[in-house]
Amino acid sequence: MIHSLILSDRRNNQYKTLGILIFIIYPILSFPFILKGILKRERWAYLLGAILMGYIGMLYPPAGDMYRYAEDFNLYKELDWEYFWIFMALKFDYFLPLLSWILGKLGAYPESTRFLFVACSYYLLLDLYHDTTLSNKDMTRRTRVYSLILLVPLTFSIYLFRMGFAQVVLVYGIYWFLMKNRKKGLFFIIFAVFIHVSYMPFIFIAIASRYKIFNFSSNVFCYLCFLLIFIESSSLGVTLLRSLPFSESLLVHLEEYISGSQSENLSSQFTVRQLIAKYFFNIVYYITLYQYYVFYKLNPQPLKIKRFVNIFIIVIIMSSSVPILHARLLDVLKVFLILSSLCFMNNSFRMQRLLRIVVVFTIINILFSFWQIRFFLKFSRIDVLFTSSSVSIDRFSLYG
């Protein structure tokens, strides 16, 4: 028995060493090793998988907001500490400017921020996968594979932006603060606000979730879900915003999302295929909401998690007059509901069937997301990933 355990441990170490060596020499070939290591819940595989996705993010072209990030990066690196803080006074999302300034002073290129955003996002997602699959003893190997697809999607492009990175940090913090009762979760929730200020309501939601006033019956929760799905616009979000004790400059910044250029609902400009993609996302969202409702009735979850979701849904309903913020909050809700469902997933036929449906539509959404960024992929340098070693990729820069 002991001899077989020693041999198994030795084989695992050899497999790990081989995977790391291949990653250094030719990272794309190490993907099968990384995937197998992830399914076996090996930390080294999480790290290499996150770095590999970070490479893809680094080689992606600086389009849209990423171009502005690159321009700001090149500006910040030329500033001394005193002038940099003058620029910081005009910002409300402090993390990216500070990170850009530090990396710029160290001689890094703008691509380094994209690498860190994507790599850190995937490592946090893989850590959630690790803890979720370990905590739920009822999970089969197939369910673990489903969990990997749902929690660690290949849609890397959303993590290139502050919003996507902040969303991952936020969900990570909510998980540890509410589900695991760890104080480090509150740190990540606050950190997410410094990455993107629009997630500030979650600080209040996390604190309010400890109060019993938000204990709702399953019927009240069902009514909230009905409002969430069918209410399209409301002035409650604007009224709530004006009642909060924020500085005037911050209120002006936030109101840009309500009455400024950020408030426009772009759905009317979508093509037929983009609308189809949106509806597929909504299907995933509705199914996960129904899944959570079933768990809500069965009562397997701690009350503080239920209270958190109840308050969260109320805030989303009130934000319906702010299309871009409303959409972002719905994204966070979808991820959290999936995470919550996986934590309490059982092997009943109904739950497994719903899980398979969510996985199928999630895969379709992933394919749609690649179709949507096909134009940018043509101008990316992802081909470098197939011809270079890790050392060469680390030194690679579109500006070099």
Which stretches of residues belong to each language-model region?
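Transmembrane-helix signature of polytopic, membrane-embedded enzymes
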Residues: 40, 129-151
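Membrane-interfacial loop-to-transmembrane alpha-helix junctions, especially the N-terminal start
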Residues: 41-47, 299-311, 353-360
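Membrane-interface alpha helices of multi-pass inner-membrane proteins
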Residues: 153-155, 184-208, 317
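Membrane-water interface signatures at transmembrane helix termini and the short loops
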Residues: 155-170, 174, 195, 290-348
